[in-house]
């Protein structure tokens, strides 16, 4: 396994862990002028780009993809899109942890699939198995599993108090 590619694949997870466990510090760091969810989204997009570049660095692309690619990628991305559509940026990027009032959502996929955005992301990664070595897909997926576990143990008392 290429060490740099492995580091790139894992890069966002320490950031997500730190935000989840130190929400008030992040809110304070962002200050009154910057929305903590928006700043998190921007940083996350940069980290996601690094993850994707890491995968491309070890990938062997070929066309056409295997048949399993299409349903896994399509449904995985549908779940990601749907979660973002229902929760918005603040709901997707830890808004509740940062002291925002995010309404509870019960529409599909919530209430049917536990952690639908993580499930969708893992499905999308699995779709790429014909191009990317298994160990990188596994490593990235384990990062999501770690975050699902961490977020399932949420302590509401650890939520940040909004400074706005």
Curated annotation (Swiss-Prot):
GO terms for molecular function: phosphatidyl-N-methylethanolamine N-methyltransferase activity; phosphatidylethanolamine N-methyltransferase activity. Residues 1-21 dip into the membrane without crossing it. It is found in: Endoplasmic reticulum membrane. Residues 53-69, 152-164 are cytoplasmic. GO terms for biological process: methylation; phosphatidylcholine biosynthetic process; phospholipid biosynthetic process. It catalyses: a 1,2-diacyl-sn-glycero-3-phospho-N-methylethanolamine + S-adenosyl-L-methionine = a 1,2-diacyl-sn-glycero-3-phospho-N,N-dimethylethanolamine + S-adenosyl-L-homocysteine + H(+); a 1,2-diacyl-sn-glycero-3-phospho-N,N-dimethylethanolamine + S-adenosyl-L-methionine = a 1,2-diacyl-sn-glycero-3-phosphocholine + S-adenosyl-L-homocysteine + H(+). Coiled coil: none annotated. The chain crosses the membrane at residues 31-52, 70-90, 132-151. It comes from the Eukaryota. It is a multi-pass membrane protein. S-adenosyl-L-methionine binds at residues 74-76, 154-155. Residues 22-30, 91-131 are lumenal. Its main location: endoplasmic reticulum. Disruption phenotype: No visible phenotype under normal growth conditions. It is an enzyme of class 2 (transferase). Its EC number is 2.1.1.71. Keywords: Endoplasmic reticulum, Lipid biosynthesis, Lipid metabolism, Membrane, Methyltransferase, Phospholipid biosynthesis, Phospholipid metabolism, S-adenosyl-L-methionine, Transferase, Transmembrane, Transmembrane helix. Belongs to the class VI-like SAM-binding methyltransferase superfamily. PEMT/PEM2 methyltransferase family. HAMAP family: PLMT (MF_03216). Catalyzes the second two steps of the methylation pathway of phosphatidylcholine biosynthesis, the SAM-dependent methylation of phosphatidylmonomethylethanolamine (PMME) to phosphatidyldimethylethanolamine (PDME) and of PDME to phosphatidylcholine (PC). This is Phosphatidyl-N-methylethanolamine N-methyltransferase.
């Amino acid at each position: 396994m290429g060490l740099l590619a492995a580091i790139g694949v894992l890069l966002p997870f320490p950031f997500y862990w730190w935000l989840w466990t130190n929400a008030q510090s992040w809110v304070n760091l962002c200050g009154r002028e910057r929305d903590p969810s928006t700043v998190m989204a921007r940083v996350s997009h940069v980290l996601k780009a690094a993850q994707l570049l890491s995968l491309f660095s070890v990938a062997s692309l070929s066309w056409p993809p295997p048949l399993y690619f299409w349903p896994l990628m399509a449904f995985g991305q549908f779940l990601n899109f749907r979660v973002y559509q229902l929760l918005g940026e603040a709901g997707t990027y830890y808004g509740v942890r940062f002291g925002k009032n995010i309404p509870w959502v019960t529409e599909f996929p919530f209430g049917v699939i536990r952690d639908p955005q993580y499930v969708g992301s893992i499905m999308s990664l699995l779709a790429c198995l014909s191009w990317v070595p298994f160990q990188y897909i596994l490593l990235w997926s384990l990062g999501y599993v770690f975050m699902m576990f961490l977020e399932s143990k949420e302590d509401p008392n650890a939520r940040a108090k909004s400074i706005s």
